[in-house]
Amino acid sequence: MRSTPVRLSAVLGSGALTMALVAAPVSPAAGAPRATEKDPVAVGSGGAVATVDAEATRVGLEVLRKGGNAVDAAVAAAATLGVTEPYSAGIGGGGFFVYYDAATGEVHTIDGRETAPQAMQEDAFVENGTPIPFNDAVTSGLSVGVPGTPQTWDVALDQWGTISLGEALHGATQVALRGFVVDQTFVDQTAANAARFAEFTSTSELYLPGGQPPAVGTVFRNRDMAATYDLLAEQGVQALYNGPLAQEIVDAVQEPPIAPGVTRLVRPGLMELGDLASYEALLREPTAVTYRGLDVFGMGPPSSGGSTVGEALNILETVPLAEIGETQALHHYLEASALAFADRNRYVGDSDHVAVPLDELLSDGFAAERACEISPLTALTKPVAPGSPDGDYDATCGSATSAALADEEGLSTTHLTTADRFGNVVAYTLTIESTGGSGIVVPDRGFLLNNELTDFNFTDTQGGNDPNLPAPGKRPRSSMSPTIVLEGGEPLLAVGSPGGSTIITTVLQILMNRLDLGMELPDAVAAPRATQRNTASVQAEPGFPRAELAALGHLFANNPEIGAATGIEFLDSGLLQAVAEPQRRGGGSAGVVIPS
């Protein structure tokens, strides 16, 4: 294990350190990493990058400045997030990549979702007739799906990039070697996972040096991750799917490196070498709806993001939100979200394994039938029943309720957005599912494995024909919603967010804020959020207006923080506006190649 945090003061000589103790604070030595200021908004030209992390944004911008395009920058930034935001993303996970090609005017998507091993059966998360406790399922080899992120990068660069994988990984490798300055968010996430990280020798050695999380202000280096990136640069991603890394991943899944004295039953996983060798990141058709004259593109199954955001937008388009006032606009947003989530839960899964009525879910006729259930006077009783996307729409309004579903989809994940001087745009959401994934670091490789398979429903939630039960080679349903909006065939904006199933409502609310309520994109991102996912109560951040909505019958529960979005808008002036969070998750980082 070659990954250690180092206090900034430790790089100084003892004399300098002694002087620092009695005088001014110590500055880092020349060449040592320094905490980078995060700017949540940047306006300019030549290209733009927005991520949650200043290092990742910097690396992406460097690629653009050297002549790379939006795809090159997206891969480089994502690889850097695997170093600086390792509890949310990395090569042990997966994601969804949405790309607008300025040369053709077309939108393409890559499905890099993690996949169930061939040995996984429908009852994989059931023991003695009872579902495995969720937290125990997460922290196990059983939860680990075949990673898709490395192949996503490879496919993206091969299809649309201009640089090699090795070139794309260079900046991230340097960050891993040089280190980054630990902030409070990193410390908090480590501390929240410390108990389960301590259960695995490889994880505790990397992330709990001396048995404790790294301190704020220390420099965290991950030389194992750098060496792993070097291996991928030299041998290509097949080193992970068919080469030396494959066996190491399978060993970690089948025989997790459990620390002595651990009392948790850490279940082994089912992954075999053949599962890695047969994995494919897939090019899929994007979802597409028209909203207020704009074309909105998203990710299709196995993500439910594009279909659910798209259905909700279709429902909202039946109402002139800009003319009815804030309370009614938010009321309709919450109701449309609940209706779309009911349909998501009932119908959406991996379309290679189940029949998903995607065209009907995104049809105007179905939206009109669902919209007629919304009353401006009172909130629907939640949870609402799913509709019938059968092509026979007579605007007959339903009113039935259904059983509530537990939502245990992990709130981790990260989203980045890039654009280049040619007008190409990427919206890319990637994840290892829960914060810290499965908790298992592949020994001496510097990265965590995902727990993506806990995104399957453990048992049937739909009274038959549940679309999201485990199956061999199946991809669990996702909520990731990378979204690109075109106006007249040209990019207007791109946006996405982490946050489990709240991703869908975060993206939907930002779109409504920007396109209907007249907010500029920075304000649309920063505005207080609420999420209604067909549950009895609405989870809302502080500052979200509740009183008048409560008078309509909406019930509220507190949620301190929902999502952590990034986006880019193409302004009328011809400039780019890159936007990240000003506060959530410690704030994000937006940058442009040439500031205005």
Where are these regions (language model features)?
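N-terminal export and membrane-targeting signals
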Residues: 1-16
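C-terminal region of N-terminal signal peptides and the immediate post-cleavage residues
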Residues: 20-37
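Noncatalytic scaffold domains of N-terminal-nucleophile
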Residues: 32-58, 62, 70-235, 240-241, ...
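Alpha-helical support elements that line or immediately flank enzyme active sites
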Residues: 63-64, 151-159, 235-242, 247, ...
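Active-site rim segments in enzyme catalytic domains, especially the processed small/beta chain
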Residues: 83-109, 126, 259-272, 424-493, ...
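Short beta-strand scaffold segments in enzyme catalytic cores
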Residues: 89-90, 94-101, 414-418, 482-484, ...
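Internal maturation/activation junctions in enzymes
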Residues: 269, 321-431, 445
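Extended C-terminal subregions enriched in glycine
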Residues: 422, 473-475, 507, 516-560
